[in-house]
């Protein structure tokens, strides 16, 4: 998926594509494709910490806010279940408000939620509240992606070890 995504942006030129690989293998893949990683985040993949995730998220948000980049895309393994880890590509910035609205519209408790939405007085204002909370939500998203990817890696390793153990027990001697 990394290669496919890089092909989508190939018209921009390699020097205009900034990659922040998390993990040793991803960093090696980025280098092999001829790109220069924008930092080393190898340890973050093994033991994700909120502090490191916060720093990475702040850096990505600053690049976007400063118009250094026009979008940020996250590619990671989403842990669906022990037997299923899905490689996921997700737009991080700019926020896709239409997609968020669709998710809310599809929520099974939408009617029940709507009755509560009109009962709140927000101070100082909705805009200020969103401006305060949005960076925190974006930082939490990076941390969640790191945790998700870490869980996927552990699940894949466990399945591989179980399969190898089964092969040991079933091989003819």
Residue ranges and their predicted role:
Residues 1-171:
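C-terminal beta-strand-loop-alpha-helix "lid" module of Rossmann-like NAD(P)-dependent dehydrogenases
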């Amino acid at each position: 998926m990394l290669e496919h995504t890089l092909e989508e942006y190939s018209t921009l030129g390699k020097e205009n594509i900034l990659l922040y690989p998390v993990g040793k293998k991803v960093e090696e893949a980025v280098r092999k494709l001829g790109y220069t990683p924008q930092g080393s985040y190898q340890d973050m993949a093994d033991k994700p910490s909120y502090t490191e995730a916060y720093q990475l998220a702040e850096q990505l948000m600053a690049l976007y806010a400063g118009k250094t980049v026009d979008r940020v895309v996250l590619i990671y393994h989403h842990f669906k279940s022990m037997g299923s880890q899905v490689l996921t590509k997700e737009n991080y910035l700019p926020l896709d408000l239409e997609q968020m609205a669709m998710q809310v519209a599809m929520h099974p408790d939408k009617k029940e939620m709507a009755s509560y939405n009109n009962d709140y007085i927000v101070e100082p204002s909705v805009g200020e509240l969103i401006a305060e909370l949005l960076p925190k939500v974006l930082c939490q998203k990076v941390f969640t992606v790191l945790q998700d990817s870490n869980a996927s890696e552990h699940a894949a390793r466990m399945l591989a070890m179980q399969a190898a153990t089964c092969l040991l027990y079933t091989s003819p001697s």
